[in-house]
């Protein structure tokens, strides 16, 4: 599949108010991706997650597998050790070639995300999108989480694994996401200050999460989210 882009120059405070973007960060097993898809149907706008990897591959000519290897995670155990020992500076990168390659892949994805925010209304799940679009005026950022027992139960059912294995997968995936965000955004992925608001998907359910986000979009951008129009 081919994707077309209008590569733009981005400056602080940009982002067309004729379209809007919702970014969703999520804990593994919280249902954040599913909430994004439900929201997409309700609002009539696309929801992007791993499609961004395909877009980045088409745009750059780099094999999609390269982007899959760094999908919200860092390559190499030395990265984890470096993250634990060295304070993160927003513009600081180590000299290892593998890390620089990862940084290049991230920058390509970031350009795709910025271009989407400039050209269409959409939902972006993960990919550090809240940070990438932090200076855009047309963006709402949401963090979705759920209690561990709820995440374990959901992963057990979804992947047909034991509770022990589900727990391991949650810890591993969330650790990857934490390190990824800390590296590229220079902050704590779970810090609520990074987002417009946070939601406990287990407390109120996915449907009500969708409704709350729609209400926030309506208030923030003065948009009728109950009767959206094409291209809004």
State what each model feature region is:
Residues 46-57:
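Short beta-strand-centered segment that lines the nucleotide-binding/catalytic pocket of NTP-utilizing
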């Amino acid at each position: 599949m081919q994707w077309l882009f209008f590569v733009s120059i981005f400056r602080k405070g940009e982002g067309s108010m004729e379209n809007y973007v919702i970014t969703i960060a999520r804990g593994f097993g919280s249902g954040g991706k599913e909430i994004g898809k439900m929201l997409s149907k309700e609002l009539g706008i696309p929801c992007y997650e791993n499609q961004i990897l395909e877009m980045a591959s088409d745009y750059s000519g780099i094999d999609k597998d390269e982007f899959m290897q760094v999908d919200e995670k860092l390559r190499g155990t030395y990265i984890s050790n470096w993250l634990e020992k060295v304070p993160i500076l927003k513009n600081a990168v180590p000299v290892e070639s593998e890390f620089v390659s990862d940084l290049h892949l991230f920058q390509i994805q970031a350009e795709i995300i910025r271009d989407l925010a400039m050209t269409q209304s959409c939902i972006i799940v993960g990919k550090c999108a809240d940070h990438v679009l932090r200076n855009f005026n047309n963006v709402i950022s949401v963090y979705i989480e759920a209690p561990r027992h709820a995440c374990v139960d959901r992963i057990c059912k979804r992947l047909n694994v034991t509770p022990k294995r589900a727990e391991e997968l949650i810890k591993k995936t969330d650790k990857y996401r934490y390190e990824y965000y800390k590296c590229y955004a220079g902050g704590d992925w779970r810090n609520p200050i990074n987002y417009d608001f946070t939601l406990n998907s287990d407390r109120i359910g996915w449907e009500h999460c969708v409704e709350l986000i729609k209400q926030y979009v309506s208030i923030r951008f003065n948009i009728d989210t109950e009767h959206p129009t094409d291209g809004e």
